[in-house]
Swiss-Prot record:
Forms heteromultimers with Trpgamma and, to a lower extent, with trp. Interacts with Fkbp59 in vivo and is found in the inaD signaling complex. Residues 710-728 are annotated as: Calmodulin-binding 1. Residues 1-340, 395-431, 534-548, 667-1124 are cytoplasmic. PANTHER family: TRANSIENT RECEPTOR POTENTIAL CHANNEL, TRANSIENT-RECEPTOR-POTENTIAL-LIKE PROTEIN. The chain crosses the membrane at residues 341-361, 374-394, 432-452, 513-533, 549-569, 646-666. Residues 1-24, 978-1013, 1031-1124 are annotated as: Disordered. SUPFAM superfamilies: Ankyrin repeat. Belongs to the transient receptor (TC 1.A.4) family. STrpC subfamily. This is Transient-receptor-potential-like protein. NCBIfam families: trp.
Length: 1124
């Protein structure tokens, strides 16, 4: 055979795992790209890396690089490579060794970042910089997408941001790494269109990953000059994304909460009022804040605009706002309730006097007091309460009652004449006061729009109520003016028109319409009073809940209206004719007037279902019990029609009354529960918005005093230009100083935040990962010490006498899966059936296989074509496949073993029979003796079975020859020839079960060219791991009269096909059959495992028979030396 072709990845073509077709192992079909079955040497390699065995890893890599017999870039069943295992264990020396020895890094950099292994990240970044070529993808981009642990769009910087690791982010940013800028979700550029067309899911997830990186607190701290405003903007942008892209709403909302929490955490680091004031008043467009100046609170206004409720409700900010709110009234919060009520009542009664004083002398003491936020609030609230009082007087016609009680005789006569003259009346004195208030309200809203802008104005829901209220009042004023002109014209033509009673007016007379709009405006005016409840801690949460419930009512109204309209259409179509009959009975008077006296019932019933609008009204009032079954007793109605009408009405009552109304109640209860859960935050946020409206430099005078000219208004006109010039000069002079001061404070906050994060991390309790890390470091140090001692000529065999170290459950599970050949692939459920429906013609399952669909032959008859089509349809049917599985399982609860497991099953049976036979040889053997054989790194089932059989054999041997003391043989230790002879003699009478390498009786090895005699003599009797099959087949003792077994034949050269590779089937061959040129030799069940060491010239020095997989972790074989 010629030499095998070497692949670029360091794997020979004969053992390449990247085959052109999926491989099937143990009934599993492994798809392309997924981890392929491993060779035994590859399993040993991964196991040595996981346990930190540097010497053996170094030897395996050297041998692999010279002979190309294994794939050093192999993966375990879960897709983890050697570098990944070393990174998970945070073994920097192992990572350096693997990188230096040429192991492909693949996505190891991402794994190191994910594990937050900073040293490995630095090493892998340097390695990536060395091997990267311009125009080619990076190492982590070359990983197969089927086995990649990370999404293709993930970059090192993005992953570090996801982990929020400040140190790794700093390293990457210092190197010039950058996070890609996300496109707008509505972006229509060529790149976005192409990515969406290729894979819309991947494009959407890529946007989520980018925003997850951008929301990292550490990344914001490192890249933003103003982390607080950056967090605000990201939070608001994520809110818009959540509303636009509903599919990823939960992810975006989680990121939004993360940004909000980061802003609050930064705010936690403020320590003085000066720091807090500078942060909240920073505005690049205005002059810097100085202690004692009026606070603009620009940052707080932005927080309210971005709805940062937790930031606004923070205790630091609330304390500062409280001090500003009650400025000018020292000690007010410490007063008793009675004193507070007296103080507020005094301001409420004297508010006109305060307003007049401010209009005349705005800079006096009283004028300065009125500019304080709390006093301004009390003045405005008192003025609004007085307006509501005027509305009550107008609605009750109090001016007429006052004339009747306190008026003179002439005034009473004029009042009587006005009552008779109902048309063409001018507004009363109280109505004129209302007009002045309305003008003041409109002017106040106009000033607010100019001050804050239209967008900010529309964000406040209470402004909508103000706008609606003002619109209604203005409409009333216009209609009253139009009605007065119209009526005055009519009276001028006919004076008797002024005495027409109101019941004779037209239905849509302008004055009647104005009165209706005036009543609606009064309702909104009274509701605006709820806004003042935000000040009170008890009524504030109720006011917020009311706002949420209004939103629920609006959402519920759409469904309710749909159901109402549907049933109204049906009932109107069914009962319109009979309603028309009732209407004809009602309107029987001359002129088409309704006869309410004689036919009052008909006049009521026809309106119920006379048209679509009346039907809708009837169903609406039916929700409140205002419509009954009597309304269906119409003239001439038939029983069938009446039945269908009642059935539809009953269905509407069930759906709308029982279901939908209860749904509305549940929605409102849920809204209140949400507010109650966060009542403190919600109330403080609502109260802060109310406070901020009085902190602003808005109109100090309330309506209607704000429309009257004052001294301050005149002074402001003449000083406007000079103030503008002073402000610009101040801005230019202090802009740099302001930025420097704010920047220093923000850096201090960031430093404190990072330091607090590190302290919190250091104070975390010790976890299981920390303990495992310590164990791994101790294990690695043990292997290094053993190698040093062995290279120094010391005997380290006694190190193997130590009992097996307990391993974490995670490591046990990983080792079991690795050695068992575990694969993440579906099992093919199918089998070959004979004509009688038996599996493989034997009535039992040998191996589950999928029968292939028959191919079309070159020439076939019509009959053959029909048979082929019918068989294809049968094989593709689900029923056939399920029946195949059922026949294969034979109605068994556990199924049958596969072909690869049959030999293990037979060996288990033989082991049970052999144990019984050994016990029957000497039933009185003592108990409690332990086996001198130690099996390491086997699965629990195999280790327990071997230990049990060894104990039985040892007890029988000790009971028959008590004077002969058994020799304990540690693993990887040379067994003397004299001990072997004693054992062979003992096996003739009472066989002792040993698990060791089979060798010829001759103690002296036969010279072999190219093989170190010293190495063979030193390691010829090292114990090898055996599975139960090899134990029974080769090492189990037989009866005294049974003929001795022949030695095992020499194993052929391996082909390394995973389909014939059986893990755990390891057996030592005869010494004369070993060759230094063979690394591993195997057949279906036997292996000879060797680790070849090379001298400096590349020649063979010797061959170490590694005992088992445990030798990698328990000790390191010494490099054999030449003997003279």
């Amino acid at each position: 055979m010629g030499r095998k072709k070497k692949l670029p990845t360091g794997v020979s073509s004969g053992v390449s795992h990247a085959s052109s077709a999926p491989k099937s192992v143990g009934g599993c079909c492994v798809p392309l790209g997924l981890p392929q079955p491993l060779l035994l040497e590859e399993k040993k390699f991964l196991l040595a890396v996981e346990r930190g065995d540097m010497p053996n890893v170094r030897r395996i890599l050297q041998k692999a690089l010279r002979h190309q017999h294994i794939n050093i870039n192999c993966m375990d069943p879960l897709g983890r490579r050697a570098l990944t295992l070393a990174i998970d264990n945070e073994n920097l020396e192992m990572v350096e060794l693997l990188v230096v020895m040429g192991v492909e890094t693949k996505d190891a950099l991402l794994h190191a970042i994910n594990a937050e292994f900073v040293e490995a990240v630095e090493l892998l970044l340097e390695h990536e910089e060395l091997i990267y070529k311009e125009g080619e993808p990076y190492s982590w981009q070359k990983v197969d997408i089927n086995t990649a642990m990370f999404a293709p769009d993930i970059t090192p910087l993005m992953l570090a941001a996801h982990k929020n690791n400040f140190e790794i982010l700093r390293i990457l940013l210092d190197r010039g790494a950058a996070v890609p800028v996300p496109h707008d979700i509505r972006c229509g550029c060529e790149e976005c269109v192409r990515l969406t067309a290729e894979d819309s899911l991947r494009h959407s997830l890529s946007r989520v990953n980018i925003y997850r990186a951008l929301c990292s607190p550490s990344l914001i701290c490192l890249t933003s000059n103003d982390p607080i405003i950056t967090a605000f903007q990201l939070s608001w942008e994520l809110r818009n994304l959540a509303l636009t892209e509903q599919e990823c709403k939960s992810e975006y909302m989680d990121l939004r909460r993360q940004c909000q929490k980061f802003a609050v955490d930064l705010l936690d680091q403020t320590r003085t009022s000066n720091e807090l004031a500078i942060i909240l008043n920073y505005d690049p467009q205005m002059s810097s804040y100085e202690p004692g100046d009026r606070m603009s609170l620009t940052r707080l206004v932005q927080a309210i605009s971005y709805k940062q409720k937790k930031f606004v409700a923070h205790s630091n900010i609330q304390q500062l706002l409280s001090s500003i709110w009650y400025d000018g009234l020292p000690g007010f919060r410490r007063k008793s309730i009675v004193d507070k009520v007296i103080c507020i009542a005094q301001v409420a009664v004297l508010f006109p006097l305060y307003c007049l004083i401010y209009m005349c002398a705005p800079n006096c003491r009283t004028g300065q007091l009125m500019r304080k936020p709390f006093m301004k609030f009390l003045i405005h609230a008192s003025s609004y309460l007085f307006f509501l009082f005027i509305l009550i007087l107008v609605s009750q016609r109090a001016d007429d009652d006052f004339v009747r009680i306190f008026g003179t005789t002439r005034m009473k006569k004029e009042l009587a004449e006005q009552e008779l003259r109902q048309r063409g009346q001018t507004p009363s004195k109280l109505e004129l006061i209302v007009v002045m208030y309305v003008i003041g309200f409109v002017w106040e809203e106009v000033q607010e729009i100019f001050a804050v802008g239209m967008k900010s104005y529309l964000r406040n829901m209470w402004n909508f109520i103000d706008f609606l209220r003002n619109s209604l009042y203005v409409s009333v004023m216009c209609l009253r003016a139009f009605a007065y002109i119209q009526q005055a014209t009519e009276i001028a033509r006919d004076p008797q028109m002024a005495y027409i009673p109101r019941e004779k007016w037209h239905d849509f007379d302008p004055q009647l319409i104005a009165e209706g709009l005036f009543a609606a405006a009064n309702v909104f005016s009274a509701l605006k009073l709820v806004h003042l409840f935000s000040i009170n801690p008890h009524l504030g949460p109720l006011q917020i809940s009311l706002g949420r419930m209004v939103i629920d009512i609006v959402k519920f109204f759409f469904i309710y209206t749909l159901v109402l309209f549907a049933f109204a259409c049906g009932l109107n179509q069914l009962l319109w004719y009979f309603a028309a009959l009732e209407k004809s009975k009602c309107y029987v008077l001359p002129g088409g007037e309704a006869d309410w006296g004689s036919h009052g019932d008909s006049c009521m019933k026809w309106r119920r279902f006379g048209n679509l609008f009346e039907s809708s009204q009837s169903l609406f009032w039916a929700s409140f019990g205002m419509v009954g079954l009597d309304d269906f007793e119409l003239s001439g109605i038939k029983s069938y029609t009446r039945f269908w009408g009642l059935l539809m009405f009953g269905s509407y009552s069930v759906i709308n009354v029982i279901v939908l109304l209860n749904l509305l109640i549940a929605m409102m209860s849920n809204s209140y529960a949400m507010i109650d859960e966060h009542s403190d935050t919600e109330w403080k946020f609502a109260r802060t918005k109310l406070w901020m409206s009085y902190f602003e430099d808005s109109a100090t005078l309330p309506p209607p005093f704000n429309v009257l000219p004052s001294v301050k208004w005149v002074i402001r006109i003449f000083r406007k230009s000079s103030k503008t010039i002073d402000r610009q000069r101040s801005k230019k002079r202090k802009e740099q100083e302001q930025f420097s001061e704010y920047d220093n404070i923000m850096r201090s906050l960031v430093w404190r935040y990072v330091a607090a994060m590190h302290r919190k991390f250091e104070n975390n309790p010790v976890s299981e990962d920390d303990i495992n890390e310590v164990k791994s470091e101790i294990n690695t140090m043990r292997y290094e010490m053993l190698e040093i001692f062995e290279n120094s000529g010391m005997d380290v065999s006694s190190a193997n006498k130590k009992e097996r170290q307990p391993r974490p459950r995670r490591i046990k599970v990983w080792e079991r899966r690795l050695m068992k050949g575990f694969q993440v692939a579906p099992v093919q459920n199918g089998c070959e059936l004979d004509a009688f429906g038996n599996v493989n013609g034997q009535g039992e399952m040998q191996e589950i296989k999928v029968e292939s669909i028959p191919s079309k032959p070159a020439k076939e008859t019509a009959k053959e074509r029909f048979q082929r089509v019918a068989r294809t349809v049968l094989l593709q049917s689900t029923t056939h496949k399920w029946n195949v599985v059922l026949r294969a399982a034979k109605d068994s609860q556990i199924g049958r073993c596969t072909k690869n497991e049959r030999k293990s099953l037979q060996n288990l049976g033989r082991a049970i029979e052999e144990a019984k036979r050994l016990i029957m040889l000497n039933p009185g053997c003592p108990s409690g003796r332990e086996s001198p054989i130690r099996i390491e790194f086997e699965d629990e089932k195999t280790s327990t079975l071997l230990e049990l059989l060894n104990q039985i054999s040892a007890e029988i041997s000790d009971s028959e020859k008590p004077k002969i003391r058994p020799i304990w043989r540690p693993p990887l230790k040379t067994v003397p020839a004299r001990a072997m002879a004693a054992n062979n003699t003992r096996s003739l009478t009472a066989p002792e079960l040993k698990i060791s390498r089979k060798s010829s009786p001759a103690p002296t090895p036969t010279p072999t060219p190219g093989v170190s005699h010293t190495a063979l003599s030193q390691f010829r009797n090292r114990e090898l791991p055996l599975c139960p099959s090899k134990l029974i087949a080769n090492s189990a003792p037989s009866a005294p009269t049974a003929p001795p077994k022949k030695s095992a034949p020499t194993a052929p050269t391996p082909t390394y096909k995973p389909t014939t590779h059986a893990p755990f089937s390891v057996e030592g061959g005869n010494r004369e059959n070993t060759r230094a040129s063979d690394g591993v030799r195997s057949d279906n069940s036997n292996f000879d495992i060797h680790v070849v060491d090379l001298d400096e010239k590349g020649g063979h020095l010797g061959r170490d028979n590694v005992s088992d997989i445990s030798s990698i972790a328990s000790t390191s074989p010494q490099r054999p030396k030449h003997r003279n």
